[in-house]
């Protein structure tokens, strides 16, 4: 296990200006990140971070705030609140959340978008009630909740659902690799998807607060930029309007590949 100081030092060496603490971050590593805050700040925290003592390992869907199960929501509520407070303590102003999944008996077929939309309606209502309870905590800590798009059909909220959930302290969080997987599988409702062309003053409330940058070939994600088929030029407007732009490569991505990905993005976005 790398120490927090080592990770922070490597990020500084690679030219990154801020960190996102991921869901694999341990309590021991947090000490190291705190020791480097004067050199590289923490901009965002990915729930659930640090790894809860009760959990065997980090996982972004240990708890699901978007659930029709009362007990599941109650447990998730406690941990999301802790993450909001932890983010504020680290000086971060955003918490990235995998909200939950729209469950059904069996699995959604690849083309079963209509059934997915219908089953999501109840979850939207339940999740909105949870968000209402979170708003005072978010506002008190000056932390925005970022709802990440997920790379599977049952992932919640979907593009057509997130617009009914956002507000001053709740915003979309766009994972570019996940977005590509969803597009390749034709899961995105063309009438309501958030596109670069939609980022106008009257719709900026739907502009993502942050981006997770990764590439994808369609059946995978978290590749370095330039190794997949994500249309990064089309995402430039999103990046310009986002508060946080976070590289999120897979753990097995080598340092030289990561550096090439950074350079690819700099050329693409003329940075």
Language-model-detected regions and their locations in the chain:
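Short acidic/polar active-site loop segments enriched in Thr and Asp
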Residues: 17, 93, 209, 243
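N-terminal pre-domain/capping segments
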Residues: 1-82, 88, 142, 170-171, ...
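Acidic/histidine-rich catalytic cores of soluble enzymes
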Residues: 19, 131-229
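Aromatic/hydrophobic pocket-lining residues that form the small-molecule binding cavity
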Residues: 4, 76, 80, 127, ...
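A cross-domain feature marking catalytic cores of carbohydrate-active enzymes
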Residues: 1, 21-25, 44-49, 97-99, ...
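Active-site acidic/histidine proton-transfer and metal-coordination neighborhood
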Residues: 65-171
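Alpha-helix-loop-beta-strand connector modules within alpha/beta enzyme cores
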Residues: 36-51, 127-134, 138, 166, ...
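Short amphipathic alpha-helices and their capping/turn segments at secondary-structure boundaries
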Residues: 23-43, 79-94, 159-165, 188-206, ...
